[in-house]
């Protein structure tokens, strides 16, 4: 009773912890996942309605930020200013907003409330034609200023920093000096004495291209560990698929319905990991993401998680093992799976597109409540199914469900530990200094999902004794008939049976005479007309057995 009560209260505790939409790793990819890599190449039209361009990333040491300018000649004078700042805390990068660039630059100039170091430089161009030419910056540009009282470590470097591309020159303004989170800001000041010329040309000046290249091409320090992780997970799911196909091919005659569901989850997981890995490779070599691939990956992830939840629900209900059909419960299962697919797909698509962050957060809330309700339903169904198996004394199926329940409980316990760890390490700290481990916040949930999937594969693997887990009507009816006597024995266990004495009166003789009369009636008087007519029509023992079977069905 205590264990059952704990299982019912557990989903509520997980929801109150709050950081994740799914208490079970098998159901979830974790918190608001950032599985896809961020782009490292931008094309910004100037003017774009604002004079500032900025981004925040975790970069490798010696990562170079390139600028390229293309467009039509113009008579406007342009003042290009760069700022590159490192930070000791990832919070500074995460909380940075493009709308607050001017306020951030004021803090940077006053050296207050910020950590790390920064480089800055400014160059004036008399017209656009000069801007489009290959530029060479002197050592004054690489001047590095310490923040928060740090010692002056930067030295002026008189080496020219010029990069010549294949077609158009790329200006090389800045290079990172350590592995750290960085904020890069470009300010474009437009000034001209000819107001009319300025007004005419503002609508079509030029395009600025920003590229970030490091030791792994366009892949940043934040995304490189995730690319390796998805490559490994893609290999793992391929091995899962090969193993499951081999098992299924050996025992294809005795496959259960649930084993087809497990195969579908493996296939969708393989596709999901392959699409994510392909997206990381595209970012690495091209610097830009394919939005269609991102949406496809998120939809595949939503379908996989929805199918996984549906699989666990029908297993916990005992479908195909304890019950031949779900009946009315089937509609509830379908509605639950469809709702989860809707909310998870909507949340994932809105998150990767980045168009409606507030709407994505709103979609996350019902997803968390739905996931918690499903978890509650699963554990309640498991307890009821295990009680039924105990009553029927089906040791094989009961052992299977015990292992399955223990696996889910371990998954919940691991999820609680990871929720507490990620909350204390990444969310409630004032300075996220462990930014190298940020990728774990996303990877750990996918890894835990795969581990639980592997346990389920082992528990429900196809084998020669596959049918011992299947529902069989005859055996279930026999078990229901046989369970009554053991239950009576357990109920009266410890009680003594009083011996009965034969009464001296003549009741026993009367009872014996009645039994003899009943025996003669059963032997000589037919119970129905069919007992008299059918024997004359039967020609063989086989026909008698068929007739007996048909009569039993009619009764």
From Swiss-Prot:
Cellular component, GO annotation: cytosol; Golgi apparatus; Golgi cisterna membrane; Golgi membrane; plasma membrane; ruffle
InterPro entries (alphabetical): GOST_TM, GPR107/GPR108-like, TMEM87A/B_GOLD
Compositional bias ranges of the Polar residues kind: 502-511
Compositional bias of kind Basic and acidic residues: 484-496
Residues of the signal peptide: 1-21
Cystine crosslinks: 74-128, 89-431
Ranges where the record places region Disordered: 473-516
Effect of substituting residue 292 to N: Reduced mechanosensitive channel activity in Tmem87a-expressing cells
One biological process term in Gene Ontology: cellular response to mechanical stimulus
Sequence intervals crossing the membrane: 226-246, 258-278, 306-322, 326-346, 362-382, 404-424, 438-458
Residues bearing attached sugar chains per UniProt: 79, 127, 157, 160
Record's keyword annotation contains Transferase: no
Domain of life per record: Eukaryota
Keywords: Cell membrane, Cell projection, Disulfide bond, Glycoprotein, Golgi apparatus, Membrane, Phosphoprotein, Signal, Transmembrane, Transmembrane helix
Lumenal side: 22-225, 279-305, 347-361, 425-437
Free-text function comment from the UniProt entry: Potential monoatomic ion channel gated by mechanical force, implicated in normal touch sensitivity through the generation of mechanically activated currents. However, a direct channel activity is debated and an alternative could be that it functions as a chaperone for an unidentified mechanosensitive ion channel. Could also be involved in cell mechanosensitivity regulating cell adhesion and migration. May also be involved in retrograde transport from endosomes to the trans-Golgi network (TGN).
Note: Named Elkin, from the Greek word Elko, meaning 'to pull'.
Family recorded in the similarity comment: Belongs to the LU7TM family. TMEM87 subfamily.
Protein name: Transmembrane protein 87A
Species whose genome carries this gene: Homo sapiens (Human)
Gene assigned in the entry: TMEM87A
């Amino acid at each position: 009773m205590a264990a059952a009560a704990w299982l019912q209260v557990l989903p509520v505790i997980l929801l109150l912890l709050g950081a994740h939409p799914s208490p079970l790793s098998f159901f979830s990819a974790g918190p608001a996942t950032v599985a896809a890599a961020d782009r490292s190449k931008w094309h910004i039209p100037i003017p774009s309605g604002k004079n500032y361009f900025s981004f925040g990333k975790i970069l490798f040491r010696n990562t170079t930020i390139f600028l390229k300018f293309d467009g039509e000649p113009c008579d406007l004078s342009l003042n290009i200013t760069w700022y590159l700042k490192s930070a000791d805390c990832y919070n500074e990068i995460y909380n940075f907003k493009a709308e607050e660039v001017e306020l951030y630059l004021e803090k940077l100039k006053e050296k207050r409330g910020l950590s790390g170091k920064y480089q800055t430089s400014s160059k004036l161009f008399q017209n656009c034609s000069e801007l489009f030419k290959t530029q060479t910056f002197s050592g004054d540009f690489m001047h590095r200023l310490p923040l928060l009282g740090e010692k002056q470590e930067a030295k002026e470097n008189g080496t020219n920093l010029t990069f010549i591309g294949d077609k158009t020159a790329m200006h090389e303004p800045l290079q990172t000096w350590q592995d750290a989170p960085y904020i890069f800001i470009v300010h474009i000041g437009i000034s001209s004495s000819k107001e009319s010329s300025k007004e005419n040309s503002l609508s079509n000046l030029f395009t600025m291209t920003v590229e970030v290249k490091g030791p792994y091409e366009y892949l940043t320090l934040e995304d490189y560990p995730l690319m390796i992780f998805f490559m490994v997970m893609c290999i793992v799911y391929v091995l899962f698929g090969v193993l499951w196909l081999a098992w299924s091919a050996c025992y294809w005659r005795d496959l259960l319905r649930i084993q087809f569901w497990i195969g579908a989850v493996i296939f969708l997981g393989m596709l999901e990991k392959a699409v994510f890995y392909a997206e990381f490779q595209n970012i690495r070599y091209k610097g830009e993401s394919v939005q269609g691939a991102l949406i496809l990956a998120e939809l595949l992830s939503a379908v996989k998680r929805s199918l996984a939840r549906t699989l666990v629900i029908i297993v916990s209900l005992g479908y195909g093992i304890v019950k031949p059909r779900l009946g009315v419960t089937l509609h509830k299962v379908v509605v639950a799976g469809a709702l989860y697919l809707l909310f998870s797909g909507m949340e994932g698509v809105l998150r990767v597109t980045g168009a409606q962050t507030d709407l994505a957060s709103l979609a996350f809330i019902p997803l968390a409540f739905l996931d918690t309700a499903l978890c509650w339903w699963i554990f309640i169904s498991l307890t009821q199914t295990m009680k039924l198996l105990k009553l029927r004394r089906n040791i094989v199926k009961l052992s299977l469900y015990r292992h399955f329940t223990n696996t889910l409980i371990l998954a919940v316990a691991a999820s609680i530990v990871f929720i507490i760890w990620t909350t204390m390490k990444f969310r409630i700290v004032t300075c996220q200094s462990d930014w190298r481990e940020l990728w774990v916040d996303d990877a750990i949930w996918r890894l835990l999902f795969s581990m639980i999937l592997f346990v389920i594969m082992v528990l429900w693997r196809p084998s020669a004794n596959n049918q011992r887990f299947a529902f069989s009507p005859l055996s279930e009816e026999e078990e229901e008939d046989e369970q009554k006597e053991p239950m009576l024995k357990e109920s009266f266990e410890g009680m003594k049976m009083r011996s009965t004495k034969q009464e001296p009166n003549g009741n026993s003789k009367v009872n014996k005479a009645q039994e003899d009369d009943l025996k003669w009636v059963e032997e000589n008087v037919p119970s129905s007309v069919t007992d008299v007519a059918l024997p004359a029509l039967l020609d063989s023992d086989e026909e008698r057995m068929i007739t007996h079977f048909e009569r039993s069905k009619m009764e």
